[in-house]
Amino acid sequence: MAETAVAMRKRLEAYIDLRRELKMQALRLDQMRQTVGDVKSPRYEPGKASATPGDAVARSVVALEALEERVAELADREAEEHDALERIICRVTNAQQRALLRLRYFDMMEWPEIAFSFYGDRIDYITEERDYVAKCYRLHTRAVSSMCTVRRRMIA
């Protein structure tokens, strides 16, 4: 079944979401690694048994290992989808469309940044930035359409 432009956009947005999730979980993992050995000072509460500091460390290590596994899974999924998208993008015939897709989805640039990278050297860029961003939107629409065409050819 051929992908429609709507389905391709959803796929690209899902890829961005996957990249963001991977980045956030990797940051969380780094933070957890920095604090895994920290033991909180026990509070004395009469009549309550307190857990030993070793229990907290053991739980932290188990949580750290689980998060490491999750980050590795996300990284594998991201790499697979990156490769699949790159195979499609490299077959798009228009160089500017390829560049836009890579800037947006692989470099995670926002639209004004993309517009500046394409048109920032123009004399009227500052006053007409909105028009240049809109031009990028239109180019993106054509690029997604081109990706759908490429995908149909790859499947056939």
Residue spans of the language-model regions?
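Short amphipathic alpha helix immediately N-terminal
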Residues: 92-110
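Hydrophobic, well-ordered secondary-structure scaffolds
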Residues: 77, 83, 101-102, 114
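Helix-turn-helix DNA-binding module
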Residues: 108-132
